[in-house]
């Protein structure tokens, strides 16, 4: 659940450190969070995130299921419209993801191109 925790840490007060002890490449998505304006860096098995008041919209690419979900959550709190590409990753693990978020009040839509 690191991507979702990092999405939250991006806008939380203070500094957060998230550790991944198994799969170091799991932090690849942090570069996409940085595209949204996140103050984050990775160092081996750790990601350090300094919370900021507001993320900004940007096009981002999902590299896997959880990274995609985390990017969608970050995009929901970003200022403006965020496009998350390669959402087929999300579809593999979270059926009806968009519909569930909409039912919770999220301003999100799937755009087919």
From Swiss-Prot:
Its main location: cytoplasm. One of its GO terms (molecular function) is UDP-N-acetylglucosamine 1-carboxyvinyltransferase activity. It is found in: Cytoplasm. InterPro entries: Enolpyruvate_Tfrase_dom, Enolpyruvate_Tfrase_sf, MurA_subfamily, RNA3'P_cycl/enolpyr_Trfase_a/b. UDP-N-acetyl-alpha-D-glucosamine binds at residue 22. Pathway: Cell wall biogenesis; peptidoglycan biosynthesis. GO terms for cellular component: cytoplasm. Its EC number is 2.5.1.7. Keywords: Cell cycle, Cell division, Cell shape, Cell wall biogenesis/degradation, Cytoplasm, Peptidoglycan synthesis, Transferase. It is an enzyme of class 2 (transferase). GO terms for biological process: cell division; cell wall organization; peptidoglycan biosynthetic process; regulation of cell shape. It catalyses: phosphoenolpyruvate + UDP-N-acetyl-alpha-D-glucosamine = UDP-N-acetyl-3-O-(1-carboxyvinyl)-alpha-D-glucosamine + phosphate. It comes from the Bacteria. Cell wall formation. Adds enolpyruvyl to UDP-N-acetylglucosamine. Belongs to the EPSP synthase family. MurA subfamily. This is UDP-N-acetylglucosamine 1-carboxyvinyltransferase. It comes from Mycolicibacterium neoaurum.
């Amino acid at each position: 659940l690191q991507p979702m925790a990092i999405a939250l840490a991006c806008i939380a007060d203070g500094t957060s450190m998230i550790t991944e002890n198994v799969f170091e490449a799991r932090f690849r998505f942090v570069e996409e969070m940085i595209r949204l304006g996140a103050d984050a860096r990775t160092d081996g098995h750790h990601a350090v995130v300094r919370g900021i008041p507001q993320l900004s919209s940007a096009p981002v690419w999902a590299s896997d299921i959880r990274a995609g979900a985390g990017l969608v959550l970050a995009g929901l709190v970003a200022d403006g419209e965020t496009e998350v590409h390669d959402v087929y990753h999300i579809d593999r693990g979270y059926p009806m993801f968009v519909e569930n978020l909409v039912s919770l009040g999220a301003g999100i839509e799937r755009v087919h191109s």
